[in-house]
């Protein structure tokens, strides 16, 4: 298997022993992104919507570094620390992700790294 490690300074560096993304053939597996500002390495605002937008912005930067974009997504997995924010996350995703929408799972979790309220990961096909 041939795999290429994808990395970009336009998204936060990994905060653990993993890559921002791994590309094999035409498939790209993007690690989860939270609402970290790549410049400050801090969570943006305290606002849920700002975190969701930043997480998708970070994911888009990694997608572009792989040669694609969020339009190439075939699957998203969303992680929320509060499932009561499900509708809000949906509305933001509908604004930032082009149609037709990919497959998706949404998972409620007890906590996320750095106190984030939202995380998103993706699989792309280029």
PLM feature segments, named:
Residues 2-126:
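Short, polar/acidic, helix-capping and beta-turn segments at strand->helix junctions
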